[in-house]
Regions:
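Conserved, well-structured core segments that form or line functional sites
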Residues: 2-213
Length: 213
């Protein structure tokens, strides 16, 4: 582990892979099987609101999946899920947190990847201020913590992830060799048997430790 440091002097332990400067992702990246996109998003960069980092944990959801919002069909709330790939699907969870998802597959498919955690690398001071007195490893280690840290709100539902204010970039630097492991999804009551949680192996920034094999 190495450490990034905010201007306030707060050290943040990192994997040592460094801050990647990959190329921006395009719509074709998201216009694929949601499970392939989920696995490939691990190690990619995510920036928004003056903060961001590298995606280290995601989960995939599809309309045929009982845990997916689209399982019950199209509604006003989930309409963005049925739109084009590369859009942000943001929803308010349990009246507490905004959660950020990336819409995937061709229009009408209703599939998305939930961004569960990032390793914070950019704009540490801004994220620390938004999160309060959070410990560095707690800044973005959960889908609600993440959106609070970078400032994603419900009004960003339907925004494109392919253009400002979002910036999602391909794996670069040491992250091109990231090992991705899968496990059952967490925080849901249906579809718990599917191994559609994808994480960067050995990351200290996951929302919850991976189960022991």
């Amino acid at each position: 582990m190495s450490a990034a440091r905010s201007t306030s002097g707060t050290a943040v332990a990192t994997t040592g892979a460094g801050a990647p400067e990959g190329r921006p992702l395009d719509e074709a990246f998201f216009d694929r099987s949601v499970h392939d996109v989920a696995r490939d998003l691990v190690g990619c960069g995510l920036r928004f609101g003056g903060g961001g980092g590298v995606i280290v944990e995601v989960e995939s959801y599809h309309a045929d999946d009982p845990a997916c919002h689209a399982y019950i069909g199209r509604t006003q709330r989930n309409a963005v899920l049925f739109d084009r790939p590369g859009l942000a699907y943001v929803y308010f969870s349990y009246g507490v947190h905004n959660l950020l998802n990336a819409v995937c597959e061709p229009p009408g498919s209703a599939a998305a990847v939930l961004i569960r955690a990032i390793e914070p690398l950019w704009g540490l001071d801004a994220m620390i201020e938004r999160r309060g007195r959070a410990q560095p490893r707690e800044l973005c280690s959960g889908p609600g913590k993440l959106t609070e840290a970078i400032g994603v709100e419900l009004r960003h539902n339907g925004a494109s992830l392919l253009e400002p204010p979002f910036e999602v970039t391909a794996r670069a630097g040491g992250w091109e060799r990231v090992e991705v492991v899968s496990a059952p999804r967490i925080g849901i009551s249906r579809g718990v048997e599917y191994p559609w949680r994808f994480c960067a192996a050995g990351s200290a920034f996951l929302s919850r430790p991976l189960p022991r094999s």
